[in-house]
């Protein structure tokens, strides 16, 4: 009896799952692991976003200057993204995006973007951003993670490991709590779960680069990214690392890559 046959069969099945689960990202054109349709992720996003806002203090832009600033910067980043996709004859890639920016009163140093353009900024990160330019860096970076479908890839990996790669609807009906937790972790909603998963260095570099492009196109200064990450790192010295750093690891090499990409990002000024 050949004891290796079951192992070979299992290996081939895993390979088939990966091949069938690969799709092309509409922004980069690169293949990625994603067996969850974007429309399903957006549908879940809208539900989770509403639930999150119901359980947190959302600051009104009519009454709070910082909330108004988040809305203002967010609107400019959104217009920049829409121009970029229009100039690339790729506006269809934004189908289902219903942009929404909210500031919540929470000391957590964090910000995130769910599929479909659902963004939350925590007041705890504002002492580190300090200005509109740095806030644009943060928003551009977070929106890029969503447009690049990094969270979808992470959730696909988690579902493959934990529920065998079944359809999202099946996972929600059979293991609703676990599936919702996977979704929240995949998008760095740290206050809703006990831990979050760090983005890979590859994902971070992609989000940094596209985020800088949106920042420039929106009329902000991209060089503020270097000062922002310096302040972020200083804020963690001697203390528990901010939630933002747990999902967005930073180091000297990263800042070097950001600095090296700035000339390329500046080519998008005025576009």
Name these PLM-found stretches.
Residues 10-19:
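Bacterial N-terminal signal peptides
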Residues 7-9, 22-271:
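A Zn2+-metalloprotease active-site environment signal
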Residues 2, 19-21:
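Intrinsically disordered, low-complexity segments
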Residues 1-11:
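Bacterial N-terminal signal peptides that target proteins for export
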């Amino acid at each position: 009896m050949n004891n290796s046959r079951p192992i070979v069969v299992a290996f081939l099945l895993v390979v088939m799952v990966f091949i069938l689960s690969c799709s092309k990202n509409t922004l980069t054109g690169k293949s990625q692991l994603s067996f969850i349709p974007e429309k399903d992720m957006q549908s879940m996003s809208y539900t989770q976003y509403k639930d999150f806002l119901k359980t947190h203090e959302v600051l009104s832009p009519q009454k709070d200057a910082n909330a108004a600033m988040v809305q203002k910067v967010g609107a400019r980043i959104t217009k920049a993204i829409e121009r970029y996709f229009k100039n690339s004859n790729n506006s269809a890639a934004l189908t289902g995006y219903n942009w929404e920016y909210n500031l919540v009163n929470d000391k957590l140093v964090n910000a995130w973007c769910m599929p479909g353009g659902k963004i939350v900024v925590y007041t705890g990160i504002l002492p580190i951003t300090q200005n509109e330019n740095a806030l644009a860096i943060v928003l551009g970076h977070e929106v890029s993670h969503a447009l690049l479908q990094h969270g979808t890839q992470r959730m696909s990996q988690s579902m493959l490991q934990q529920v065998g790669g079944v359809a999202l609807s099946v996972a929600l009906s059979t293991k609703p709590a676990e599936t919702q937790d996977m979704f929240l972790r995949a998008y760095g909603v740290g206050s809703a779960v006990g831990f979050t998963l760090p983005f890979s260095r590859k994902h971070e570099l992609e989000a940094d680069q596209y985020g800088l492009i949106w920042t420039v196109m929106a009329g902000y200064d991209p060089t503020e990214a270097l000062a922002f990450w310096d302040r972020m790192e200083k804020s963690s010295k001697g203390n528990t690392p901010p939630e933002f750093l747990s999902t967005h690891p930073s180091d000297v090499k990263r800042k070097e890559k950001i600095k090296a990409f700035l000339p390329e990002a500046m080519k998008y000024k005025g576009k």
